[in-house]
Amino acid sequence: MDYSYDEDLDELCPVCGDKVSGYHYGLLTCESCKGFFKRTVQNNKHYTCTESQSCKIDKTQRKRCPFCRFQKCLTVGMRLEAVRADRMRGGRNKFGPMYKRDRALKQQKKAQIRANGFKLETGPPMGVPPPPPPAPDYVLPPSLHGPEPKGLAAGPPAGPLGDFGAPALPMAVPGAHGPLAGYLYPAFPGRAIKSEYPEPYASPPQPGLPYGYPEPFSGGPNVPELILQLLQLEPDEDQVRARILGCLQEPTKSRPDQPAAFGLLCRMADQTFISIVDWARRCMVFKELEVADQMTLLQNCWSELLVFDHIYRQVQHGKEGSILLVTGQEVELTTVATQAGSLLHSLVLRAQELVLQLLALQLDRQEFVCLKFIILFSLDLKFLNNHILVKDAQEKANAALLDYTLCHYPHCGDKFQQLLLCLVEVRALSMQAKEYLYHKHLGNEMPRNNLLIEMLQAKQT
């Protein structure tokens, strides 16, 4: 079923930038992309891209590459399950509550606009992505000039999209064992975990836009209950820093040919991930799942959570010329450029571009905790046992973020979509980081007894 919207708000299709005609298959889109998405799903069409799977999709070029257009549809959040399989007109009416909530908030925003006597300014069309970034060239630690990986093999075709717009990784559901087992329950019976593969991304998010948001309102009744609960679950930064510093000071058996800085950074990431696992264990819904589902979710998103943790630390740091480590140490970008390999430098610069975009979006702590929760549950339901509980968490997280952004940032109606697009870039960054770490692992250059190695060993199965 298609829902109407208020034309006074003059929104643009997130796929191609054309004028939207209503709610179609999960979000506001134009008639052209609505029809294209419906035909593709109902006819089970399979497209190929003759270029690099990063074609520009806008109003004038949307028909040139159906592969990239369909990937863009999925990336921005159009729902496969909303298309009727019987080829009848209309979609499945399962997103009605979200449509109604969105429409009510837009009506409220329009009333505020009219009352205040100013016109809503919208950003440029989201269907016009920037040029694709250069080929991934990055190294993890400073002072490392070893051989750089060449010819990274691409994974299998993209899997179905998760419920938050970010592509869900195609992977088998493992049992209640593996590298995470010892962190989820006391026993540590096994090591084997199933494989997870990277997939191409339809398009990166847009560069930072100077929206000029007002400061968000303080907490209170206007903050969704889910976000308030997540704020209470956030770990204390000082305690995390002290624990990680203590672990880094413990002696370890490092490889004689391994640079000290590289080993420290790997241990730093390892301990940060342990903190993330501890956070996940305390999260509502997640702690109610069986261990197999918990491990499946974490194996899907562990690298994204690590990357997003680093990104938000830089957003808080707020300095373009340096990065802040979890230990509190500040590293100048000029130092990274001169002492790190070209691979690490490239990855750091790409991460900093996302930091600038989130600064322009004025990402706040409430949005950060909600996005982190979204990442945790961003796996397609078919890979999980408890569909009902996870689906409920997905829908509530989406609704909470939508409500919060529209209520606290009424001058930018597309902030919700822009934030979800940023998660696509987070996943792309995490895939590149994993590819590098895996090649370092194959080169026998990773530290021993490292949890990240256990996660990376999924590549070998």
Swiss-Prot record:
Residues 230-461 are annotated as: Important for dimerization. Changing residue 341 to E: Reduced transactivation. Strongly reduced transactivation. Residues 119-157 are annotated as: Disordered. A 1,2-diacyl-sn-glycero-3-phosphocholine binds at residues 341, 436, 440. Residues 10-85 bind DNA. Binds DNA as a monomer. Interacts with NR0B2 and PPARGC1A. Part of a complex consisting of SFPQ, NONO and NR5A1. Interacts with NCOA2. Interacts with DGKQ and CDK7. Binds to and activated by HIPK3. Changing residue 92 to Q: In SRXY3, SRXX4 and AINR; decreased transactivator activity; no effect on nuclear location. Signal peptide: none annotated. It is linked to 46,XY sex reversal 3: A condition characterized by male-to-female sex reversal in the presence of a normal 46,XY karyotype. 46,XX sex reversal 4: A condition in which male gonads develop in a genetic female (female to male sex reversal). Residues 126-136 have a biased composition (Pro residues). This is Steroidogenic factor 1. It comes from the Eukaryota. Changing residue 269 to F: Strongly reduced transactivation. Changing residue 293 to N: In POF7; without adrenal failure; partial loss of activity. Belongs to the nuclear hormone receptor family. NR5 subfamily. Changing residue 440 to A: Loss of transactivation. The modification N6-acetyllysine is found at residues 34, 38, 72. It is found in: Nucleus. Keywords: Acetylation, Activator, Disease variant, DNA-binding, Isopeptide bond, Lipid-binding, Metal-binding, Nucleus, Phosphoprotein, Premature ovarian failure, Receptor, Transcription, Transcription regulation, Ubl conjugation, Zinc, Zinc-finger. One of its GO terms (biological process) is response to gonadotropin-releasing hormone. There is a cross-link at residues 119, 194 (Glycyl lysine isopeptide (Lys-Gly) (interchain with G-Cter in SUMO)). Gene3D superfamilies: Erythroid Transcription Factor GATA-1, subunit A (3.30.50.10), Retinoid X Receptor (1.10.565.10). A zinc finger (NR C4-type) spans 13-33, 49-73. The gene is NR5A1. It comes from Homo sapiens. Coiled coil: none annotated.
